[in-house]
Amino acid sequence: LGTRVAGLTPTPAGIAIAGGNYDAIIIATAPQHAGKLWPALAAAFDFEPIATVYLQFAAKTALAFPLQQQSGKHGQWIVDRGNGLLACVLSGHGDWEALADDELAAALVAELAMPGPPLWHKVIREKRATFACRPNIARPDHRTPDPRIVLAGDYTWADYPATLEGAVRSGRRAAQALLAKSYNPQP
């Protein structure tokens, strides 16, 4: 625990990782990191960005609902975090990526038709936040050619796109596969 895994080596005795040997493992990372450990995944995905723009207004500022869809040019979802803090979520490639943080915050304030500027703002951008869910994308199963190694993550096959629910279901499926001893541990 607390150690970044830089590689793994399947051996007859188990899976060798950072000086340790394990009967089986779950690779539970984002696909771009899983590809470093399991090279067959390395080039399988394109990625989409997500940004969250926090806008702090006066404490009495509130939306009509705690979560609402925004139909403006940039904002998609607005979450009222209480006490005047709004979180604007933007996902997928768009014009917003070219805007500086101050410009993006100002554009969202204008879309929300707020009476004045926020007290402060903070923009968090993740360029590879999720894989691009394109039609007919080939998502890997949790099983790999080595039954002692299973995959978990929202990018693996599921009934859901890239969501937290998909990641949770994937993790459960991977754990159940190993708990069922489908990896044929050594005696």
Q: Where are the regions a protein language model picked out?
A:
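Short glycine-/acidic-enriched loop or helix-start segments at secondary-structure transitions
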Residues: 36-38, 133, 161-162
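Mid-domain catalytic core of redox enzymes
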Residues: 3-113, 117, 140
